[in-house]
C-alpha cells in the first residue's frame, strides 16, 4: 500500500454502484492525476480513490481532505456533504460545486444531475482554481514538519 497522510493525502470518494463506478470513477481518476501531478512526486502529496462504502466504514479516512464525486443518489458521502456544505458554483441548477475549507477539515462535493453535469462540476473545480486553492492550503509548510 502506498503512503498516506491524514493532512496531505486527498481522498476522492465515488459511489459503489456499478453505474457510479462506470461514470464517476473515470472522473476521479482524472482528478487524481491532476492532484498527483501538482504534488510533484512528494510521498504524501497525492490522492487516493475509494468507494463510499469503504469511506463510511473507515473512520481513519474521515480526517483526510475529502472530495466526493457523483450525485447524492449514487454516492452516500456526497449525499451527506450536499446537505451541509455551502454552494460555491452552480450552473443552470444542474451542476454543483460545494465546499468548506477551514481548520476543522477540507470537504468538497462535486456533482450534477447527470453524468455530464458531474463531469462539468469536476472540470469547473479545476478550471476555476478551486483545486489549486485547496492544495495550497493543505500543502503549505507546517511548523511541525521535520525536514
Model regions and ranges:
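Solvent-exposed alpha-helical segments and adjacent loops
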Residues: 1-147
Amino acid at each position: 500500500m502506498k503512503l498516506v497522510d491524514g493532512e496531505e493525502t486527498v481522498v476522492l470518494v465515488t459511489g459503489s454502484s456499478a453505474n457510479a463506478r462506470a461514470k464517476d470513477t473515470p472522473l476521479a481518476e482524472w482528478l487524481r492525476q491532476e492532484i498527483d501531478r501538482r504534488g510533484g512526486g512528494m510521498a504524501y502529496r497525492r490522492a487516493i480513490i475509494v468507494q463510499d462504502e469503504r469511506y463510511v466504514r473507515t473512520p481513519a479516512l474521515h480526517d483526510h481532505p475529502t472530495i466526493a464525486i457523483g450525485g447524492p443518489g449514487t454516492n452516500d458521502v456526497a449525499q451527506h456533504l450536499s446537505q451541509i456544505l455551502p454552494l460555491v458554483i452552480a450552473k443552470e441548477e444542474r451542476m454543483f460545486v460545494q465546499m468548506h475549507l477551514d481548520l476543522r477539515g477540507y470537504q468538497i462535493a462535486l456533482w450534477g444531475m447527470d453524468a455530464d453535469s458531474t463531469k462539468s462540476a469536476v472540470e469547473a473545480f479545476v478550471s476555476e482554481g478551486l483545486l489549486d486553492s485547496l492544495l495550497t492550503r493543505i500543502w503549505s509548510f507546517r511548523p511541525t514538519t521535520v525536514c
